[in-house]
Amino acid sequence: MSSNPFHLFGSPSRNDSVVVKDEILSVQHLVKKYGDLTAVNDISFSVKKKSLFAFLGQNGAGKSTTINIITSILSKDSGKIYLDGYDQDHYSDLIKSEIGIVFQNSVLDPLLSPIDNLEIRAGFYGLRGAFKKERIQKLIDMLGLQSFLKRPVGKLSGGQKRRVDIARAMVHDPKLLILDEPTTGLDPQTRISVWNLVNDLREKTGMTVFLTTHYMEEAEKATYAVVMDKGNIIAQGTPTQLKNQYSGDYVLVYGKNNEDWENQFLLQGRKFTYNHDSNYYRILVKNSIDAIDFIDRNKNLLTDFEVVKGSMDDVFLNLTGVRNMEEGK
């Protein structure tokens, strides 16, 4: 798969019959059961190379189980997994060498410095000598670790730890980087800085990122998204496709509750709700063009309005009945 010296498992032949040119990961009819409980129920999806793939679902949806199977932490009951055409059933160690993972809870040794953590991890993957030093230095520069490189990890801020977590996951130059709730527990400004970093890494390295998150605004940035619920895939597509299918734009019309307004909305076949606290109607529209038409038709009724685009939060609510996911899984 790669000529880098820290890929220790040679270059076995892959099954070109299952290789799709622009796919890095293919999951086919995956099943995992725990007794009578089906944690993952015959799911199939693929991840394109160089993409940001979002894997979404509330607690117990099957996300963690699926990731643990992809990374060979758990065995599957049936199904196939291919990474860049290599069958996990035959090349599990090779596939593991091509995946990096940032866990929700940091696995860094808090008593050691970032440089010590990176050197230990690099040694685990067989990096030695000048190549090891060069790879670690590249990560230090790329992720901006220099200013706290020798400070104990336990004394770093949340954002600094996340940078080191990402460096650790990338030390072996993986083709697929899994980010499992990477910004949970971070303040909004730090979350933004982490995502700026991830986007910068994708641009510089061409690496594919597989994301799980309960922050729906992060899923908005994905190339493609899969939504899980109770072990099943209940929707998948680009964020735009999902919003068009499972959400919608809406117009906020401000003013006091007015029966004449409501009669007009009903005559036009509009779905609406009224917010008593903020005194506005929320009228569902198909898209921005429909919003403009609605505003034009009702301009004599309106004192003020606001057009709001449908969001991934709306998609998630409509699919699962849950406004947002709890932290964790």
Where are these regions (language model features)?
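Conserved ABC ATPase signature
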Residues: 152-156
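ABC transporter nucleotide-binding domain
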Residues: 197-285
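Conserved catalytic motifs of ABC-family nucleotide-binding domains
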Residues: 173
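Catalytic Walker B motif of ABC-type/P-loop ATPase nucleotide-binding domains
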Residues: 177-180
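Conserved ABC ATPase "signature" region
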Residues: 119, 123, 130-148
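Conserved ABC transporter NBD signature motif
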Residues: 79-87, 95
